[in-house]
């Protein structure tokens, strides 16, 4: 089962090319110049009450069909939605207004694009296709070790040595910050030794593993692939006991104003993302951000993500699935998932321009099982928020503090 999972992860892009219907050029990261989101001014706001329930979206949200009926937003509306709140660990809160530069506005919203299969509903479809990552050879290596757990019950993804990308509703319900988010923590999965103890912090082995994280994928293939008919001398190396988390406090949280609504405003699902800044840097390898391509540019039309589903007893759970429909800002997809996995970073594996290497990048955030408005009727779907060029520019600004490092994506 372990080797099967490894080959699934490695060979999925190859499956997409095997029928000859798609070319290698289709599966390359195409970097292009993106608009800039620039901070204009910052004002202080009153401290929140932290009384919202974690992970609960209390209203029907505007989904793909609903968005098709709306006019394209103006530049001022985009700047309003991309302005953002920052909440600090001491409870203080600020609002930063932004300006968008270098954007060419579209006259109308793009219509949705459907995938190859009819859309289905519910969180888990028929046979559960999720994989629990129990072996430390996988769980502690890239890309699985980029998945983290939030103390509010959601998941997230490491996108820099100091930052975690997650869903906005994991820390804010649209009106107030959730209970426990004032002392928000992020847990990085650590595996126990055979004796049930965690590795000693600061050990030489831990430092070597952190320093060699960039080579982990190649090492993983080499150390786990066996020749047919040859038994492993080491035997199965399945984790002993329960997983353990190394917890780090969150220093600050950024949320787009498009998610923060007043008493009369509805929730804008396309802004359901947030960035957490950690109080201290982690030693894990992180996953870079990328601009979400269209369905036709996805190898096999598939996406991937890992998170900590509540029904798997804090196990790290991986899945991949097809995208059924997309709009400018949202994806409807088939991935089996349960509560706890929301906030996970959805990633693709495409080739670097002009190279033979495949590279994974985060292109969307899993918003979860949501009730969406479909022509006036409420329906439930598994939804993800795409990282558009503007959102890439905004998240990049949050990470780097300026737009200088965010010109291409």
Swiss-Prot record:
Glycans are attached at residue 90. Its main location: secreted. It is found in: Secreted. Residues 124-404 form the Peptidase S1 domain. Disulfide bonds join 154-170. Residues 188-247 are annotated as: Disordered. GO terms for cellular component: extracellular region; mitochondrion. Belongs to the peptidase S1 family. It comes from the Eukaryota. InterPro entries: Glutamyl_endopeptidase, Peptidase_S1_PA, Peptidase_S1_PA_chymotrypsin, Trypsin_dom, TRYPSIN_HIS. In ovary, it localizes to the theca cells of pre-antral follicles, the theca and granulosa cells of pre-ovulatory and ovulatory follicles, as well as to the developing corpus luteum. Keywords: Disulfide bond, Glycoprotein, Secreted, Serine protease homolog, Signal. This is Inactive serine protease 35. Pfam families: Trypsin. PANTHER family: INACTIVE SERINE PROTEASE 35, SERINE PROTEASE. GO terms for molecular function: serine-type endopeptidase activity. Residues 1-20 form the signal peptide. Induction: Expression is progesterone-dependent regulation prior to follicle rupture. Residues 188-207 have a biased composition (Basic residues). The gene is Prss35.
